[in-house]
Regions:
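Short, surface-exposed ligand-recognition loops at beta-strand->loop->(often short) alpha-helix junctions
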Residues: 14-24
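Active-site-flanking beta-strand signature of metal-NTP-handling nucleotidyl enzymes
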Residues: 7-14
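Short, glycine- and small/hydrophobic-rich beta-strand elements in well-ordered beta-sheets
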Residues: 32-56
């Protein structure tokens, strides 16, 4: 089923309050760099809850799992990972294959 299907990462981050701004800047840098510099990155959304708080979510879509693995070697990801290492209370990562997508 996975052959030829886009690879999706869904990550929810619980950010330490004192690291919120730094994490936010690093998240935007990673998202922008991923879409701009990686042909295998199809979409990278940075989300915040409507009720506020210190949570973020990433919705990332790659052409393949290999494209995601390549993403983790990019300079913008390494900068983000360095910030996340000290900015997070917790994170939850889920991996999916996109079976169908629709957008307007």
């Amino acid at each position: 089923m996975a052959d030829g299907q886009p690879f999706v990462i869904w990550v929810v981050f619980d950010v330490k309050p004192e690291a919120f701004d730094r994490f936010y800047e690093a998240a935007l840098d990673d998202s922008t760099g991923s879409v701009r510099d990686e042909p295998g990155c199809l979409q990278f959304d940075v989300l915040a809850p409507t009720a506020g708080g210190n949570k973020f979510a990433f919705y990332e879509v790659y052409k393949s799992r290999d494209a995601f693995v390549a993403h983790m070697e990019m300079p913008h990801f390494k900068r983000f990972a360095a910030v996340a290492d000290v900015a997070l209370n917790d994170k939850n990562v889920s991996e999916y294959y996109r079976l169908q997508g629709a957008a307007k």
